């Protein structure tokens, strides 16, 4: 990048200051006539003193050199530190990305494992279901075949004679049939095989029908009935008759037993499937019972569980049902389930139609209940929004209805799966905005996506981490340290609950919402009694604390060492003022001091925190929340003490101890945010304060809202109640005549909880490439990353005009860049110009146009961008993108554009408008330090004269009065700028003095320019624009030469060489004159005036026709030459690396071309030099290439051709030189013939001939050294 002027200028300023000091030291007061007669000792002293400045000069130079070295080292260290910080940031970002990727991979692997485990579990369940279905099918099929073939296989009469027919055993067996269980299958089967029950069939049938079976016992009962049916022919008809009578008797029951109905229906279906009843008898009985159940249950659907049980266990055989779960398992795992072959499809169809009708009525009931539930929820939300809470009856009614709806929904889903039907659509009712308050987006932690911190619970990410991310003590602390503690806490809590149940209802420590409401009502009714109760409560509280203190002191006598540890811990607790320290303290307490007495000590220490240390409350609350999973009694005891202290202050109703009250309320709020203090209790505390909204209660309510109001208002479960209380508070503020201080506090608390909605700005959508360009320029660009950004910018598709225009536009809009990074954009542009020349031109034009547009529009909303543009223009000069003429033209425009010469007000520059002064100071502060030598120094001196006149003209306007004086910050800004640029400048003290300086300056330059100042002095330039143009011509090509002669780098500006510094130092010493300082005016020399007069009185160019003809002819010749050269072919020169001198000497010192072996070797080979690099060192090796190779032959031919061309050019040059010498010799002879020849006194020394026309000397060119004779 181009070398900055900043380094050189600072060094030159120091040199100028040192030179001025040296001059001041060297100057001596002129010796008067009275002081001339002095002793010789004084004269010698003066000579010794004259040596002092030289020593001082050397010391100052050494100090200056040391300072420069220190500054250079300091800058290098800063650069290294910045690079290290950047590397650290990049490493941290890489680590974060790696951690995120690792977490994502772990989550993905965990998800895949869970999916695989779920799939494996599903497969196992499907296989188990498949196996059970086939086993059940085979068992039923075998049992059905046996029962259908029973008439042919029943035993004869002689078989029964061998069985036991005793009354005792048979009656005992019949009694056992009333309590059939699956566990008794074997014993009952064994007893049945040994008994003759021919005379007890009726009793057995009655016992079986009246038996209280479970669903798991139905298979055992069906097995026993099969045994009866296979042995006794009259068992099945008797059983069928009893079942019919049993069902007829059940129709008369008002409240049938659903469990018995479910098992009976399943029992009949099982008896029909296994063939005890015929299909006609059994199916008709099942259909009648099922139809009666469904018809009686079409509205209430209380017997839906009976239908579901029937479909689950017997639906496949009776109704031909295939559940959706079975279908999906068969399709997914390619399983074949047993077909329904027992009953024909024609007999199954009525059951299917009946069940589908029932499911239709069930879905209608579900939709109806769903609508009613939504209506109830909507009404409850409205009541909460209006009143803040629900009545107990309504809340209980809603919970019961919601439970019945959930049960109905689950039954509907089960029946839909069994019938392979789809569930109906149940649309969710979207809450209206009015139900949540105006424009409030309630924060729900379960929502996917990022946290919306602007509309969420917490103010920022740090607050969220502080209140939510707590350390898990159970992961660090051994479980044995708090396991017993948890057991004891559970026992204590159980004892406390039993004690509280026995206590009377007016217990003061009750914390339920109802008790708080009762206390609130009592507050409103009986004020005097409450004050007494509050006093008694305070006494009880202090007694309790004192008793605990005495008890602990007695315990401490036995364990003094632990007491010292606990005391040291409690003393250091107020020093835990950050998250790490308080977390460490929590872990320390849990590891080393976890006893019941120490926990009480900790609670008391937290409770009696000093009222001035409000900063400790969030950390103490975090300590309590961290300890809560391991020792919950700390949070419970502290909350109960704070609750009691709060009620004491509310009931006391005094106007003292406001700091203690605020401390208690703030502590409650902090514990609420950690969810240690319940939201209901916090809201009821706020309600108690609002009930008596006066004096200290106002401050306490506002403090509570400012601590946890946003948390309560943004939480879904407490939003409605909080909004009602906030509205109540605002209504009380309007109705009551409160002090202005209280009004401000109430409004601040309200708007902190519920800030007014802000309009969200719509972000403009841009193409990705434009977004990347803006990211590079506006985010990534910094002093350290300039080189990287330049590399990325060079990779852009610059051939695309749209991309180039957008980059130029982004650079012109410099106000989008951070103010401290504007110089980085100028640095970047200077490096980019080497590859894209037109970009720099367009950017400079755009910046100048924007500055001009700002002066024309002159609106305050553009002031910041105008400051940035002015700063950018100065930085462009620092990086040699513009010349000084552009800077001074802009500065003069600030003091002249739109300014009326007569001083009348202008709309472009109003009297009270001082922003142009700020723009001038901004440019001068940016690049004015480089105008310290040469013509640019004189230009700045001249401009400062006009600038002072502009400032004093602004000060003299009538707008500024004693009541409304001229802004003092503008004066300070001007003085700071001028002190930096011209420390010795003499400022004007009035408008007249500034005008007089301008007139003197204009008159002086008019005289120097040799112009007549009679008329022109009257019409002289008002603001020095013509003067600036003349000075630009006077500066000549020095600026452009300086601009074009230096290459640019990206990282740091180039360091100037020592020779340039010496030349600039000499120039500074020669031109170290200031037109505005008194010393410079006094030290003006006659030599400078004479030089100026020579410039003014020199030859002047007179335009004539011959000049125009000459210019036209020259242009024509140049054009023809260009056209001729464009048609020629361009010959590409071959690269020929020069051989080092020491190798040339070695080659020349080789063997001569004489005879012998050396001659043959040199004739057969040609020496070449091979260049190699090893590390940073170059190595040369001589190779003798044979002449037979193509490389040597081509090189030899090329050398011969060059030698011939060289000899031809030499001969041609010699001929020209000889011809010119002959012509000159003839002219000399003619001139000598006209005048006598001078005597040659030195014949032996022949002078070298110098050709008057500058002809070349061939001997010098070709180094022949010979003489022509």
UniProtKB/Swiss-Prot annotation:
Gene Ontology BP annotations: animal organ regeneration; liver development; nuclear-transcribed mRNA catabolic process, nonsense-mediated decay; response to unfolded protein
Tissue distribution of the protein: Localized in male germ cells.
Region annotation (Interaction with UPF1) ranges: 1102-1126, 1164-1204
Region (Sufficient for interaction with UPF1 C-terminus): 1081-1269
Pfam families on file: MIF4G, Upf2
Residue positions where Phosphothreonine is found in the record: 1085
InterPro entries: ARM-type_fold, MIF4G-like_typ-3, Nmd2/UPF2, Upf2/Nmd2_C
GO cellular component terms given for this protein: cytoplasm; cytoplasmic ribonucleoprotein granule; cytosol; exon-exon junction complex; perinuclear region of cytoplasm
Coiled-coil features, chain-numbered ranges: 57-133
Main location: cytoplasm
Region (Disordered), start-end ranges: 1-125, 143-162, 422-444, 487-518, 1017-1090, 1218-1269
Compositional bias segments (type: Acidic residues): 1025-1073
Chain residue ranges for the region called Sufficient for interaction with UPF1: 94-132
Keyword tags: Coiled coil, Cytoplasm, Nonsense-mediated mRNA decay, Phosphoprotein, Repeat, RNA-binding
Protein's cellular compartments: Cytoplasm, Perinuclear region; Cytoplasm
Name of the protein described by the UniProt record: Regulator of nonsense transcripts 2
Native source organism of the sequence: Mus musculus (Mouse)
């Amino acid at each position: 990048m181009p070398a900055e002027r900043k380094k050189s200028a600072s060094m030159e300023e120091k040199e100028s200051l040192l030179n001025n000091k040296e001059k001041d030291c060297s100057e001596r007061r002129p010796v008067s006539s009275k002081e001339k007669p002095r002793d010789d000792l004084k004269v010698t002293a003066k000579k010794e003193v004259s040596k002092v400045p030289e020593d001082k000069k050397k010391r100052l130079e050494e100090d200056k050199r040391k300072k420069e070295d220190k500054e250079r080292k300091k800058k290098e260290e800063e650069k290294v530190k910045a690079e290290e910080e950047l590397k650290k940031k990049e490493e941290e970002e890489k680590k974060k990305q790696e951690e995120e990727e690792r977490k994502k991979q772990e989550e993905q692997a965990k998800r895949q494992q869970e999916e695989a485990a779920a799939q494996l579990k599903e497969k196992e369940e499907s296989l188990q279901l498949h196996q059970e279905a086939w086993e059940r099918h085979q068992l039923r099929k075998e049992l059905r075949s046996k029962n259908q073939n029973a008439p042919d296989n029943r035993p004869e009469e002689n078989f029964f004679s061998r069985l036991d027919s005793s009354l005792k055993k048979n009656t005992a067996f019949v009694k056992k049939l009333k309590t059939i269980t699956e566990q008794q299958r074997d014993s009952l089967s064994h007893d049945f095989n040994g008994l003759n029950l021919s005379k007890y069939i009726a009793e057995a049938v009655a016992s079986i029908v009246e038996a209280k079976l479970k669903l798991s016992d139905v298979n055992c009962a069906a097995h026993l009935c099969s045994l009866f049916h296979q042995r006794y022919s009259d068992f099945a008809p008797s059983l069928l008759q009893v079942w019919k009578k049993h069902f007829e008797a059940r129709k008369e029951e008002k409240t049938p037993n659903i469990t018995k109905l479910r098992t009976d229906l399943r029992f009949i279906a099982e008896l029909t499937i296994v063939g005890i009843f015929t299909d006609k008898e059994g199916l008709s009985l099942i259909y009648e019972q099922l139809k009666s159940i469904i018809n009686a249950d079409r509205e209430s659907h209380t017997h839906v569980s009976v239908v579901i049980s029937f479909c689950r266990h017997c639906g496949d055989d009776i109704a031909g049902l295939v559940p959706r779960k079975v279908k999906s398992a068969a399709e997914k795992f390619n399983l074949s389930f047993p077909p329904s072959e027992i009953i024909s499809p024609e007999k199954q169809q009525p059951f299917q139609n009946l069940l589908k009708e029932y499911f239709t009525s069930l879905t209608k009931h579900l939709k109806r209940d769903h609508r009613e539930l939504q209506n109830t929820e909507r009404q409850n939300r409205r009541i909460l929004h209006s009143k803040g809470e629900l009545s107990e009856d309504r809340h209980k009614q809603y919970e019961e209805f919601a439970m019945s709806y959930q049960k109905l929904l689950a039954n509907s889903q089960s029946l839909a799966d069994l019938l392979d039907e789809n569930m109906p659509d149940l649309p969710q009712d979207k809450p209206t905005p009015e139900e949540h308050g105006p424009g409030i987006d309630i924060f729900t932690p379960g929502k996917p996506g990022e946290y919306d911190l602007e509309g969420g619970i917490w103010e920022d990410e740090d607050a969220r981490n502080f209140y939510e991310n707590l350390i898990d003590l159970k992961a660090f602390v051994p479980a044995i340290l708090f396991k017993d503690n948890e057991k004891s806490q559970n026992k204590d809590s159980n004892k406390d609950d039993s004690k509280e149940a026995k206590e009377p209802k007016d217990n003061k420590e009750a914390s339920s919402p109802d008790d708080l409401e009762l206390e609130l009502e009592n507050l409103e009714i009986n004020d005097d009694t409450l004050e007494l109760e509050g006093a008694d409560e305070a006494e009880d509280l202090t007694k309790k604390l004192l008793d605990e203190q005495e008890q602990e002191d007695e315990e401490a006598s036995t364990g003094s060492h632990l007491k010292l540890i606990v005391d040291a811990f409690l003393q250091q607790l107020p020093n835990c003022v950050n998250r790490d320290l308080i977390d460490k303290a929590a872990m320390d307490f849990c590891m080393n001091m976890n006893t019941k007495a120490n926990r009480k000590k900790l609670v008391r220490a937290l409770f009696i925190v000093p009222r001035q240390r409000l900063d400790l409350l969030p950390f103490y609350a975090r300590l309590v929340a961290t300890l809560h999973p391991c020792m919950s009694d700390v949070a419970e005891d502290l909350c109960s003490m704070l609750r009691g202290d709060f009620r004491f202050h509310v009931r006391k109703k005094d106007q003292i101890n406001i700091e203690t009250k605020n401390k208690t309320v703030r502590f409650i709020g902090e514990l609420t945010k950690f969810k240690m203090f319940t939201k209901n209790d916090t809201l009821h505390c706020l309600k108690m304060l609002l009930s008596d909204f006066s004096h200290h209660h106002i401050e306490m309510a506002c403090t509570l809202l400012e601590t946890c109001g946003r948390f309560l208002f943004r939480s879904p479960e407490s939003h409605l109640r909080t909004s009602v209380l906030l509205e109540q508070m605002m209504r009380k503020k309007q109705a009551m005549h409160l002090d202005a201080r209280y009004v401000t506090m109430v409004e601040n608390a309200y708007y902190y909880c519920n800030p007014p909605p802000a309009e969200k700005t719509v972000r403009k959508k841009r193409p990705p490439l434009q977004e990347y360009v803006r990211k590079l320029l506006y985010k990534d660009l910094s002093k350290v990353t300039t080189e990287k950004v330049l590399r990325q910018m060079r990779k852009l598709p610059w051939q695309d005009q749209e991309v180039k225009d957008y980059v130029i536009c982004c650079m012109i809009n410099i106000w989008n860049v951070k103010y401290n990074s504007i110089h980085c954009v100028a640095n970047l542009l200077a490096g980019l110009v080497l590859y894209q020349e037109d970009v720099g031109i367009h950017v400079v034009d755009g910046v100048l146009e924007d500055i001009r547009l700002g002066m024309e529009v002159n609106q305050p909303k553009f002031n910041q961008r105008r400051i940035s543009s002015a700063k950018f223009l100065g930085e462009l000069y620092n990086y040699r993108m513009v010349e000084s003429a552009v800077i001074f033209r802009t500065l003069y425009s600030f003091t002249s554009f739109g300014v009326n010469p007569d001083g009348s007000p202008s709309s472009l520059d109003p009297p009270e408008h001082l922003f142009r002064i700020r723009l001038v100071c901004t440019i001068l502060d940016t690049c004015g330090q480089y105008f310290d030598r040469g013509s640019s120094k004189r230009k700045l001196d001249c401009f400062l004269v006009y600038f002072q006149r502009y400032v004093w003209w602004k000060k003299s306007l009538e707008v500024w009065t004693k009541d409304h004086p001229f802004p003092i910050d503008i004066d300070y800004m001007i003085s700071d700028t001028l002190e930096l640029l011209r420390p010795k400048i003499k400022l004007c003290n009035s408008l007249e003095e500034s005008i007089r300086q301008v007139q003197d300056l204009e008159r002086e330059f008019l005289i120097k320019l040799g112009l007549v100042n009679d008329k022109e002095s009257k019409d002289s330039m008002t603001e020095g624009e013509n003067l600036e143009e003349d000075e630009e011509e006077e500066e000549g090509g020095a600026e452009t030469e300086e601009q074009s002669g230096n290459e640019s780098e990206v990282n740091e500006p180039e360091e100037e060489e020592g020779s340039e510094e010496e030349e600039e130092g000499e120039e500074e010493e020669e031109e170290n004159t200031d037109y505005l300082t008194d010393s410079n005016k006094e030290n003006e020399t006659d030599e400078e005036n004479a030089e100026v007069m020579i410039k003014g009185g020199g030859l002047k160019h007179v335009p004539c026709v011959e000049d125009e003809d000459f210019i036209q002819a020259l242009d024509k010749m140049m054009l023809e030459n260009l056209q001729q050269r464009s048609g020629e072919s361009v010959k590409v020169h071959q690269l020929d690396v020069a051989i080092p001198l020491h190798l040339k000497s070695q080659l020349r010192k080789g063997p001569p071309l004489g005879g012998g072996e050396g001659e043959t070797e040199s004739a057969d080979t040609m020496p070449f030099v091979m260049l190699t690099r090893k590390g940073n060192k170059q190595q040369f090796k001589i190779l003798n290439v044979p002449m037979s190779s193509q490389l040597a032959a081509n090189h030899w031919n090329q050398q011969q051709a060059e030698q011939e061309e060289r000899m031809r050019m030499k001969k041609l040059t010699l001929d020209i030189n000889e011809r010119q010498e002959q012509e000159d010799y003839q002219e000399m002879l003619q001139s000598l013939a006209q005048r006598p020849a001078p005597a040659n006194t030195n014949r032996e020394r022949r002078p070298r001939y110098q050709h008057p026309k500058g002809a070349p000397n061939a001997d010098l060119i070709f180094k022949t050294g010979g003489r022509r004779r």
